[in-house]
């Protein structure tokens, strides 16, 4: 992409652009683009101007390049040569000429508000821009079906705008916006919007003939639809109109009686936009935010723009990846803001469920409660504590010697965790989880092998052994394999795969089967599980004691097979995680996760991708230098809290109960919590040495 235009090279620019027949006022801001980087094109709503988007532009422009303009007759743009109502096709022609004259090259991410929903899709079709557009955000947009279905049209509510002295004040738009300083906001209030005439019905009718919803015109490109509340704006104006006597009682009553129907029309027609792409999602603005979301709920607009950019960038990266992912460094936008060293914490987020087996005298029910704990922890483990709608991201690769300490406090007392990265090749995380009040403890270790073949395949090696002091009872806890599906369609989600056993030293085995969403949806359902608890003597698995059916990311039901009754339906949404407690950063050791990755995490959370990349590289380069020094000196890294043993009798006994192989650990050995090492451990754990190989 060779760039010559000042509209592409200037960090910030505004002014009139002559498109031949008239001039249009435009704005651009943001860093210069590299080849393949998208520019965000903002098409304003009906009668709206580019100035109203400058707050969002200012907040996003440190990271993204953004171009917007005001259509003919608005904000200093010339009136069009042909006066009178204009169609979306005529406006699309103006936009196409504008991009050409300004030298704004693809790829484009298009953002439209309100009437711009009709406008930008007309431009896509008329000027054959589908290949150039890599994503879209529709901000409370109208479609070709909105206007014909609306129970209230402009002639029926326009009295509100004409007779109320300051409708912007009633709607709250004249309050200083968080992304504007006072001076900038005064410019917004003092600027003449201008005027444009639109032939809405003709434009909608034309768009309808192209049947874009039926053809999924954006294929698998990311599309976000943000639903606002236009009806709420009209309600507020009606209340004010009644207060000051604007309009007739009949006019006000008609509007008020049809507001619910109006909102349903917007909900239905905006939802239809999800059919434009197989990679589409819909989010709702904050209740009461009204129609002009760029003022009332700007964060949601910014977040959805970021989401679309991230999905596009992810596709660019994924297209170049094949084979083993273990040593591939993910780009920052794909990274989660926590390390793999933190992941054992998700086993402990429900302390009461973790210790519940210690309170149960019946061994069968104890085994069931251990199975319940295992299943209840899966959702937040697989999504790394993120909202399910946000999908999955790659965690930071823990460095050798990385440490993570945490605790949880609730009615069950205090549950604690220590985890440590004990090996680099292969990467192994060891952990120890315990609750002294109830005498429940678990230690384990995990090593992941990650490959890519359209889906990310994560094979987990390792296990945990849960011990209950009161009954001197052990349980072998498996680590399920994972496929991350949907990467190429932009909606990544984890799917557990395979069959596993939880073996109990008291003579019980739980069989667990994860049946994922099969190809083309012909069989199976996403995130489903089936589990059954048996006596270990029931070798043919003919007489289950308890069975469990459901979805590990939603609800699952436990059934007592002896009575045929459902014992419990566990709802993941109704059981929020207990708050995780960690030491303040200034009290953490340099080798603790959040201290060591502090700059990286801060940059990721702040959307500063370059800063995240630089901070991450600093740690990684320091680690490479340390490994090279170890190799030259013939030294071996020694963990602080764990030691490796060639044999674990507990594991051998429990695999015999389950009837599974012991070959998995023949090479790597068994990592176990070492009480002697733990008692000797003192801060600073590695003296003056830091993870970035710089002495403190």
Curated annotation (Swiss-Prot):
Record region (Disordered): 603-642
Biased segments, Basic and acidic residues type: 615-633
Superkingdom as given in the UniProt entry: Eukaryota
Record bears the keyword DNA-binding: no
GO cellular component: cytosol; membrane
PROSITE patterns for the chain: OSBP
Role summary: Probable transporter; part of the gene cluster that mediates the biosynthesis of enfumafungin, a glycosylated fernene-type triterpenoid with potent antifungal activity, mediated by its interaction with beta-1,3-glucan synthase and the fungal cell wall. Might be involved in transport of enfumafungin to and across organelle membranes.
Family stated for the protein in its record: Belongs to the OSBP family.
Protein name from the UniProt record: Probable transporter efuK
Organism from which the protein derives: Hormonema carpetanum
Upper taxonomic lineage: Eukaryota, Fungi, Dikarya, Ascomycota, Pezizomycotina
